[in-house]
Regions:
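Asp/Glu-centered strand-loop micro-motifs enriched in Gly/Pro and often flanked by an aromatic residue
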Residues: 376-380, 394, 399-444
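Terminal accessory carbohydrate-recognition/targeting modules of carbohydrate-active enzymes
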Residues: 2-386, 430, 604, 769-773
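Catalytic cores of carbohydrate-active enzymes
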Residues: 536-556, 593-705, 786-825
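Aromatic-rich carbohydrate-recognition surfaces in CAZymes
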Residues: 429-563, 569, 592, 596, ...
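Acidic/His metal-coordination segments adjacent to aromatic residues that form catalytic metal sites
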Residues: 418-428, 472-495, 559-587, 656-658, ...
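Aromatic (Trp/Tyr) and acidic
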Residues: 567-585, 650-723, 750-784, 817-838
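Long, repeat-rich segments with strong aromatic
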Residues: 192-194, 588-628, 702-704, 741-774
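Active-site acid/base region of carbohydrate-active enzymes
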Residues: 380-405, 449, 461, 465-471, ...
Length: 838
């Protein structure tokens, strides 16, 4: 206790000032408390800073993660099962379609529907000309009088005619099933002089075989002649290709020929032409008689480019050149090693007999499907329709590879999902690849012939969908395809859509089913549905407009200074006039109508499959509501349906003024560009353009048969000062400000007047529909239907006879074909117009 009291006393004494006896403890403690307060505040700030820093780090990491997540979504596959099995194109499942003319970009060639195919093809040269013109890939610059399939059934055989100025080549192929690898096939190439040729031409045919990343090729050479190629690959097993001797057409006796061959490394298939060209040498002698010796051009040796990438995998290219004077024929045989029960060789009379049987079957099937003879078409027009159809189905290709894609989250383009694509193409010379909005039109015709092919094509396209529901609108899958495309068009952007025309084909499939769903069809539609749903949802989330039930195409050109009217490539109608100043306030009537069709088809599919359909039914009812459609898109001034946006009617292209500093002279390279001049500021209004876009509520049969707006459309269609011509409906009214106006200094009018067959098909189809619907305009529609159908058939056939081709578009003032050719993509819909099958 004493120690405790002493301790307390000492504590009390320590709190008393020795001089004045006052308690000074508070004065001594104040600084300590302030320090503690400051220390506490500092700790709070430090803690808060640490928390903020941690939150910032977490947010930064989350932002990076999310950006990376969004960046990778463009190349993330759709989670549903593929529509087509990975081996759906294999010889085990579809042996009859394993081999085919799946190389539309070359005049003649075959490959398999596989990832790494052995590739075969044909080149030719007319000898003793001032220039060496090597023909291989389909080129408009070759200026051939005509070329194309006359008959092709998509599976078994094809007959093609290629006209040069002095001779005609006929290329025929046929297949014979057997074994486990797709069986055998035979080519027959026939050369005949043109009647106008001054003498029978000497022609070199160059047959080639190339491996494309897989397989072994072994040449068999006798003297200077490559007589055969044997080989093997994982998908073909063992095989042999034999080059037979050229024969006289009449006697069938062997003809004199000179031979050359080439064996060369080939890094990629797009290099084949260049390799052959660089190997040509004019030192070889053609001497059918000792008195007539002439030097001709033949393949010799090929020296690869020095310092090529050592890591490059080189494939093998083998070329067999035979030089003969026309007329003659020559056969090439492919024989599968697994075809063990071959009773005879598939050549000569055996091949001829089988070819004739296929031709008769083709004629009979074509007549049974399209009934053109029954409709009164003469034989020459029936042959025309057969050729048009054959070029569509014979122009189908099989591609494998990756597109290059980019989203707003990717700084650089990325390789897209690797995969195959079995598809028709718009043009063998200019567009030898798949286009999304073209394909729906292509399959309207092909499905009439073979629904199995069309179902597979649709499956291939939808299997290219990513997790977002986006499908690249242009499929440029390999180096061979990329070699045909300008660099600025190679990269596909995932905010950009394309008209979902595959719904047109699916609509036709549902109509053909007529409510009778087979087990096979049900399985197919069930596989389609998850991807169709995602695709449909993608449009409704990425392409919506500023108002409910409105839509807007993304991807319009942003450099408004150089374009008279910024293009809308994504709509498929490229330079068709839209709002002059692109903005988020735009409403596009054509896209709204496409989504009306899509909603209807989705409703019908869900009904067939017994799935919930109310959402699609509600959307269809909203989009097909004529009063709401008119509220959003009817222009009282134009008396037509129209786009809406930030638009000026006073624009033109003018030479820009180049200011030259005082004391300096203008340089020669300072050419004044054509730039856009806006004389009146834009405002939100309807776009003053009457043309194809204005017709979409009619084209897709959304208008009620008794709608007064239908009468307006029919009257304006028939007006020669607007859309009507003796050759078909022009794309833009003559009264529209941008009719036949260039869009830039270098871009001629494209969808600003010329006649397009795909939209005219939709017009004829709609007229046929309204001519069968009870209403005040039924008779008017029937009259226009007959007149327009006749005009289209007459002009397109006339141009085919005169030029040898179907064309991308037709001049609205003369009817002449123009643009790329041959264009047997959607221009082939003329066959359905002839057959009145809509």
């Amino acid at each position: 206790m004493a120690r405790q009291r002493l301790k307390k006393e000492r504590l009390l004494d320590s709190k008393v000032d020795g001089k004045n006896g006052k308690n000074t403890a508070p004065h001594k403690k104040a600084p300590t408390r302030e320090k503690k307060k400051k220390s506490n505040l500092g700790n709070v700030f430090v803690t808060m800073a640490m928390i903020l820093c941690a939150v910032s780090c977490v947010w930064f990491c989350y932002a990076i993660y999310m950006r990376s997540w969004f960046a990778h979504r463009i190349i993330t596959p759709h989670p549903s099962s593929k529509i087509l099995n990975s081996n759906s194109s294999s010889p085990a499942l579809t042996p009859e379609r394993f081999w085919g003319s799946y190389r539309p970009q070359v005049y003649f060639g075959m490959k398999t529907r596989s990832q790494k195919s052995i590739v075969t093809g044909l080149m030719w040269i007319q000898q003793f000309k001032s220039e060496v013109n090597l023909r291989h890939t389909c080129e408009q610059d070759d200026r051939l009088p005509s070329y194309g399939w006359l008959m092709h059934d998509g599976i078994n055989f094809g007959v093609q005619e290629i006209k040069e100025n002095n001779f005609i080549l006929t290329t025929e192929f046929g297949k014979r099933l057997g074994g486990q690898h797709g069986g055998d096939w035979t080519w027959r190439i026939t050369a005949k002089p043109q009647s106008s040729a001054p003498e029978n031409p000497v022609i070199s045919l160059l047959f080639y075989v190339a491996s494309d990343g897989e397989g072994v090729l072994q040449p068999h050479i006798e003297g200077k002649k490559l007589v055969a190629v044997s080989g093997s690959s994982a998908e073909l097993g063992k095989f042999k290709i034999t080059f037979l001797t050229p024969a006289d057409l009449k006697s069938r006796n062997p003809k004199y020929a000179s031979y050359n061959h080439l064996q060369a490394p080939c890094a990629s298939l797009e290099m084949v032409t260049d390799i052959v060209k660089s190997s040509l040498n004019g030192r070889f002698v053609y001497s059918e008689t000792s008195a007539n010796r002439r030097y001709y051009v033949g393949v010799d040796t090929y020296k690869p480019v020095p310092n090529q990438d050592r890591e490059t995998t080189f494939n093998t290219l083998l070329v067999h050149q035979v030089t003969v004077q026309a007329p003659f024929e020559i056969e090439v045989l492919f024989e599968s090693g697994s075809y063990m029960e071959r009773s005879n060789r598939f050549s000569g009379d055996v091949f001829t007999d089988e070819l004739e049987r296929w031709k008769r079957a083709f004629d009979e099937k074509f007549d049974n499907i399209f009934h053109l003879s029954d409709k009164g078409f003469p034989p020459q027009q029936v042959k025309f329709a057969q050729a048009v159809f054959s070029n569509t189905i014979g122009g189908m290709g099989y591609f494998f590879g990756q597109s290059y894609v980019q989203s707003k989250y990717n700084e650089h383009p990325l390789p897209y999902l690797e995969g195959p694509l079995y598809t028709a193409v718009p043009s063998r010379s200019f567009f030898p690849r798949g286009f999304l909005w073209d394909e729906g039109f292509h399959q309207l015709l092909i499905s009439k012939w073979n629904w199995s092919i069309s179902k597979e094509v649709i499956g291939h396209w939808l299997d290219l969908m990513n997790v977002e529901g986006w499908i690249p609108r242009e499929q440029i899958l390999d180096n061979e395809a990329r070699s045909k495309v300008p660099a600025e068009f190679i990269v596909q952007r995932n905010e950009n859509a394309n008209p979902p025309t595959l719904f047109l084909t699916l609509q036709k499939l549902i109509e053909d089913l007529n409510g009778q769903l087979t087990e096979e069809d049900e399985t197919y539609l069930k596989k389609l549905f998850p991807r169709l749903k995602t695709w449909y949802d993608w449009y409704n989330s990425t392409q919506v407009g500023p108002l409910p039930s409105s839509y807007r195409w993304r991807g319009r050109d942003t450099d408004t200074n150089l374009f008279l009217n910024p293009k809308t490539l994504t709509s498929g109608l490229d330079d068709y006039p839209r709002a002059s100043h692109p903005s988020e306030e735009e409403r596009h009537v054509d896209l709204r109508c496409w989504m009306t069709l899509a909603s209807k088809v989705m409703r019908d599919i869900t009904e067939l499959l017994g799935l919930p359909q109310q959402d699609y039914q509600n959307m269809y009812e909203t989009l097909s509501d004529n009063s709401l459609l008119e509220e959003l898109h009817w222009s009282e001034d134009l008396k037509a349906f129209s786009d809406y946006g930030n638009h000026s009617q006073s624009i033109s292209l003018e030479r820009e003024k180049i200011s030259v500093p005082r004391g300096q002279s203008r340089q020669h390279n300072q050419a004044a560009r054509l730039v856009r001049s806006v004389r009146k500021q834009p405002k939100l209004q309807y776009v003053n353009a009457f043309g194809y876009v204005s017709l979409f509520p009619f084209l897709l049969q959304i208008l009620k048969p008794d709608s007064p707006k239908l009468q307006c459309i029919l009257k304006d269609m028939k007006d020669a000062g607007k859309l009507w011509t003796p050759y078909g409906l022009r794309s833009l009214s003559k009264s529209s400000p941008l009719y036949l106006k260039r869009n830039t200094e270098y871009d001629p009018p494209y969808w600003r007047g010329p006649i397009w067959v795909n939209l005219n098909y939709l017009v004829v189809r709609a007229l046929y529909y309204y001519s069968t619907q009870t209403g005040p305009y039924q008779e008017m529609a029937a009259t226009l239907y007959q007149e327009l159908r006749t005009n289209l058939i007459t002009n397109i056939y006339k141009q085919y006879v005169q030029t040898g081709y179907l064309w991308e578009q037709y001049n609205d003032n003369t009817g002449r074909g123009q643009g790329s050719h041959p264009f047997t993509g959607w221009s082939s819909l003329i066959v359905l117009i002839m057959a009145e099958q809509y």
